[in-house]
Amino acid sequence: MHSFDRRSKRLSWRILTYALKRMRTDPALDHSETPETLRARAGSTITEDGIGGTEALRIWTDVLAKACISVDHPRFFSYVPGAPTEAAGMFDVAVSAANVYGGSWQEGAGAVYAENEALDWVASLAGYPVTSGG
């Protein structure tokens, strides 16, 4: 693992600032890119010494994010993989920072409980019985 030093603290603030700005911005619809275009623009991102967090964030912001179709764009109706609200994004940050594994009750009872609550709510909206599952 790594230590949380001044450099890590600066990177954390840069990432959180990016996340807040992105969640508060009406996104461009953007478009996909070919692997060749991304290789030319992003370069080699996996290196023996690493590229560092600041450079990784720059590549994400300037190259990779722009090669993703923003699913919170008002004209995007194909998929809805997550809740496009600022609160949902911030809770994603909180859960990621906690670094929990929610794949089974033993390791992540709290996360699994929260997920089950959400699934039960969605099932009730669809009119499924309380015994539904799967």
Where are these regions (language model features)?
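N-terminal entrance/gating region of PLP-dependent enzymes' catalytic architecture
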Residues: 1-131
